[in-house]
Every structure is written in C-alpha cells, then in structure tokens.
C-alpha cells in the first residue's frame, strides 16, 4: 500500500496542517502536499503517530521540528503523557518521507510564486533578482566529510566540521527563492550559479557579488534570454572603455557652478584670506606665565 493510502486511512482529514501552520496553509495548496507525498519511496501499512503530511508541514515551519512536536503534542489520539512522541520518532519520520517530496514542494512553489510581480516591483521596467552564495557547517560525520569536504587551516589540520556550499537565486521583491543548489566546499560558486541561469525570467536584472565576475557566466545570462541584464560591483583597476558619457558638466565650469550653488551663503565661505601687513608674532599670557625680570638670562 502506498504511503498516501496509509495517510488516508489514518484519519478523515489527513492533509489538514497543524494549527500553528495555518499561515502556510493559506499559500500552499493541499494538492501539492498530496502530490509530493506520492514521491516518497517508502511504503507502509502501519498507523503512524506522525503521518507524512505532518512531517511536510513541520519541514516548512521556520523552527526546530522537535519544538513543534513537543508544543503541538502530535500523536494518534492527541493525548499527553505516555503517548508523547519520542525524539527519535521525528527523525525516523523525516527519513521515511525522504528528500524527494520536500524538494518537489520547493521547486513547485518557486516555479509558481517565484516570478510573480508586485506593485513597484520593477526598476526601469525590469524585475530585480539576486544570486549569492553562502557556506554552512554540517554534522561531523565521515560520509559528510568525504562528500562535502572542509576548509583548510593555517596548520596541516582541517576544519573541525564539513562545510557545504550553497548558491541561491532570490526575487528581491518578494524574497522568494527561485532556485538553490548545494555542492561540496571545493566547488566554485560561479559554476553553481551558471547551472541556474535558465531559471531567471526575461525582462529582468540580476545582482551579483564581485566574486561572480566571470565572462562566461555574464555573457550567457545576457545572450541566452530576452532583455536580461546583470549588475555587479566593479573590480579595482578594472580595464574599461567609455562608450558614452551622460549629460555632465565640463570640468572647466565646475568653479562657476560651485559659486552659483553657494547663493546667499557666501558669508559662510572664505573666498580669500587677507594677508597681514606685518609679520605674525606669538604673545605670552602675563597671568599664566609671569615674567621675572630679575631672573638670569638664558644661555
């Protein structure tokens, strides 16, 4: 029996989210939850205390799953005491569901909601996106260290934890992720960003960090789409060519323009410092430094 049939046999309303997840229920259709559970490779005929749909909703929650389970008292009969779920039950439930349903739910949400336009969500008619990378530490396990690797230190020893590299594409208007890619630490962020260029919509401008300065990446973004542009900070001493200069004032007219901007504030500015007619002298305060005329002269 598939996992979905087991969930339908669990209760009359198996796909209703927990009370604290009503915010997500307003935006995620229950049909998506039902479809993503069919992607799970696990099949069972047991009546689970923590069904798959509950696990999906808890993954969507922006808080630790153990806290959600303890606070909501998720169990088959909703009773407290001996029927509370153990800590290991939450981990086992996530392992039963697997990564495929959660990944499909993310891709479906990004495809359906990621490119939506909102009021004032444009810059000269272009939609704003951004690509950036980050690094995360993973649990120190041999299989994770072998796959992700870790950063080197000043000594021969490696970092204490394996490091995972993440590159994500975000809609700057709604802060919804359109795409995200994870890879080992040694893999370049530019290569990961190149794999998500097809996700960027047309009539858009994408912001990059200066570390993404790659000719292949930027030309592919501009040429493979329709009216797609990019923007990133310029490197120091970068070789450039001036194509067209905007309406700027001539350098020779800058002093006159500054005098015009001063207007009635001429009294604030010192245009010319008057030169004294006699040499400047340093005077000594007689009260603070009294002079003793009877003192012997300095040699």
Curated annotation (Swiss-Prot):
Organism name: Escherichia coli (strain K12)
The name this protein goes by in its record: Putative transposase InsZ
Domain of life the protein comes from: Bacteria
Listed Basic residues bias regions: 276-291
GO biological process: DNA transposition
InterPro entries assigned to the protein according to its UniProt record, in alphabetical order: RNaseH-like_sf, Transpos_IS4, Transposase_11, Transposases_IS4_N
Region (Disordered): 276-299
Pfam families: DDE_Tnp_1, Nterm_IS4
NCBIfam families for this protein: transpos_IS4_1
Other remarks on this protein: Could be the product of a pseudogene; missing an internal segment of about 130 residues compared to orthologs.
Gene giving rise to this polypeptide: insZ
GO molecular function, one term: transposase activity
């Amino acid at each position: 029996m598939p996992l979905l049939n087991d969930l339908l046999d669990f209760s009359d309303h198996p796909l209703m989210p927990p009370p604290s997840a009503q915010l997500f229920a307003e935006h995620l259709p229950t049909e998506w939850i039902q479809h993503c559970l069919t992607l799970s490779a696990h099949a069972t005929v047991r009546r689970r205390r923590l069904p798959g749909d509950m696990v999906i909703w808890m993954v969507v929650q922006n808080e630790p799953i153990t806290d959600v389970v303890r606070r909501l008292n998720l169990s088959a009969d909703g009773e407290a005491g001996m029927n509370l779920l153990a800590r290991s039950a939450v981990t086992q439930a996530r392992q039963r569901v697997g990564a495929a349903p959660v990944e499909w739910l993310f891709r479906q949400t990004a495809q359906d909601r990621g490119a939506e336009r909102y009021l004032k969500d444009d810059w000269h008619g272009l939609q704003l996106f951004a690509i950036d990378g980050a690094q995360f530490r993973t649990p120190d396990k041999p299989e994770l260290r072998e796959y992700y690797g870790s950063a080197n230190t000043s000594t021969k020893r490696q970092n204490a934890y394996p490091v995972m590299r993440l590159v994500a594409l975000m809609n700057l208007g709604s802060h919804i992720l359109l795409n995200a890619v994870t890879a080992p630490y040694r893999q370049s962020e530019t290569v990961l960003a190149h794999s998500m260029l097809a996700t960027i919509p047309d009539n858009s401008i994408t912001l990059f960090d200066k570390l993404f300065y790659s000719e292949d990446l930027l030309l592919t973004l501009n040429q493979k789409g329709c009216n797609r542009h990019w923007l990133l900070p310029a490197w120091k001493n970068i070789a450039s060519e001036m194509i067209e200069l905007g309406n700027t004032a001539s350098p020779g007219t800058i002093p006159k323009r500054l005098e015009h901007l001063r207007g009635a504030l001429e009294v604030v500015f010192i245009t010319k410092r008057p030169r004294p007619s006699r040499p400047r002298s340093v005077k000594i305060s007689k009260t603070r430094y009294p002079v003793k005329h009877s003192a012997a002269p300095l040699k």
